[in-house]
């Protein structure tokens, strides 16, 4: 399978000019966010909260797009577009570095080497308490992922980052210092300028936004012997596909990680037969099928089915 570069970063992308659809998307997201939050008092909460949560989730998808080297040739400009932390919790630089490691496809789903793996090693599983095991098992259902997943993801991310900061990790310190400045600015806008209750913003907007993004990640990868078989495709996602910037066609993204989002659907349809052959027909007919199959049933096991192989134990972190 052809790749544009192991990690799909800016160095591996085809050099092009300004990608105006992505620039327009950024204007839409930030402009919509500013208007919604500034005029929130004129809207009922049941309109404001879902609309703003959608924009925060869309912003997360845009950050994913930008870290792959879009929409300009300038990393400084791209970073300036992506770095505003309207979700509050995730430093952009931390996410960027982690996600690019995820694009080492030979290690996909590996609980030791893939930073986005949802699997545990047998040793890690045995070390967990019974309540923790239950919470992880529940998150193997779509319902559990949506309800429990955001709290689990954020709390464990904070715990891991706190360890890095305590140990004096310079990269983590830089990322969090930069992030703190952005959070202060966004918080000033939300609270001092717009008068939004911080608890309401966190619980009614950020939490559902994370849940929306977890719909995409829920079934996009599964352990398999063949590398290509580890990445799924969700077709006919006419509603959520644009929210995810067509990353629901995930096998296409992993093969061409630097391809701009608006080119993915056409490229996917041109290469559909080959992609399905390579990934073993690991495809879903929309997120409705994902929900019907896995809303209350496990999508996969918590422990990686291969256990711990010698090459996993000795591979570099």
Describe the role of every protein-language-model region:
Residues 54-66, 91, 95, 145-157, ...:
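Transmembrane alpha-helical segments that form the membrane-embedded catalytic/substrate-channel core
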Residues 67-68, 106, 224, 244, ...:
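Short active-site segment of divalent metal-dependent hydrolases/proteases
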Residues 74-76, 178-179, 240-241:
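Short helix-capping and inter-helix turn/linker motifs at the boundaries of alpha-helical repeat units
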Residues 61-80, 106-116:
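Aspartate-rich (DDxxD/NDxxD/DxxxD) Mg2+/diphosphate-binding motifs
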Residues 40, 70-75, 126, 233-236:
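Helix-boundary and loop/linker segments of multi-pass membrane transporters
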Residues 64, 99, 129, 221, ...:
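Divalent metal-coordination and catalytic microenvironments
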Residues 78-87, 229-244:
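Membrane-cytosol interface motif
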Residues 1-55, 85-199, 262-317:
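Non-catalytic, topology-defining segments of multipass membrane proteins
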């Amino acid at each position: 399978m052809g790749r544009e570069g192991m990690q799909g970063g800016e160095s591996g992308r085809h050099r092009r000019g300004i990608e105006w659809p992505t620039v327009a998307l950024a204007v839409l997201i930030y402009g919509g966010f500013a208007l919604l939050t500034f005029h929130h008092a004129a809207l009922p909460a049941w309109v404001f909260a879902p609309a703003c949560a959608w924009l925060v989730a869309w912003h997360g998808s845009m950050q994913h797009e930008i870290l792959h080297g879009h929409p300009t040739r300038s990393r400084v400009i791209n970073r300036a577009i992506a770095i505003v932390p309207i979700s509050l919790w995730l430093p952009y630089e931390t996410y960027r570095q982690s996600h690019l490691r995820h694009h080492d496809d030979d290690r996909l789903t590996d609980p030791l080497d893939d930073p986005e793996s949802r699997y545990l090693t047998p040793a890690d599983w045995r070390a967990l308490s019974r309540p923790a095991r239950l919470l992880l098992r529940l998150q193997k259902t779509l319902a559990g992922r949506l309800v429990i997943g955001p709290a689990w993801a954020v709390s464990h991310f904070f715990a891991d980052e706190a360890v890095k900061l305590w140990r004096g990790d310079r990269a983590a310190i830089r990322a969090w210092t930069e992030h703190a400045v952005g959070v202060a600015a966004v918080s000033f806008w939300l609270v001092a300028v717009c008068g939004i209750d911080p608890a309401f913003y966190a619980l009614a907007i950020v939490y559902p936004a994370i849940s929306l993004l977890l719909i995409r990640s829920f079934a996009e990868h599964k352990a398999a012997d063949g590398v290509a078989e580890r990445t799924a495709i969700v077709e006919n996602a006419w509603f959520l596909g644009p929210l995810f910037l067509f990353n629901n066609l995930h096998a296409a993204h992993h093969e061409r990680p630097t391809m701009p989002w608006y080119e993915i659907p056409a490229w996917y349809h041109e290469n559909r037969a080959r992609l399905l052959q390579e990934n073993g027909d690991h495809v879903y007919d929309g997120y409705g099928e994902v929900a019907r199959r896995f809303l209350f049933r496990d999508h996969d096991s918590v422990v990686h089915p291969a256990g711990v192989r010698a090459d996993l134990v000795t591979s570099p972190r």
